[in-house]
Amino acid sequence: MMQKLAKEIYNWCQSKGLWGDNIIYFNGKAWSSNPTWSGEKGKEIADELYEYEDRNPLDYFEYANPKTLSMSFEGALYEALNAWDLPCYDGTEEELQGIFKKYDLYWEFGNAWNLSAYEL
């Protein structure tokens, strides 16, 4: 279920121009927009999407939920979720919550640059 959610988040970000400097953590792995991570080359699984094994979000930020899905972001997604008062981003947060809700989850910020999923 988490991989399906991760794929939907990735597709949504791509369609909105929000994919870049993002990492989605789930099931002990990470999907990143970056082709390398500390010198390790990721396995390319889609356009600008690289998979890394053995990644725990708690190793990278304090407010993470390795039991579901966590995500860190900079760039366009960071701006969209934190500059919500700009007209060009109207509804972005609600759209993303809607994706999580389909999986009986909701997300909340840990810091301004990361979020984690929790059961409804």
Give the ranges of each region predicted by the language model.
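C-terminal edge-of-domain segments
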Residues: 114-119
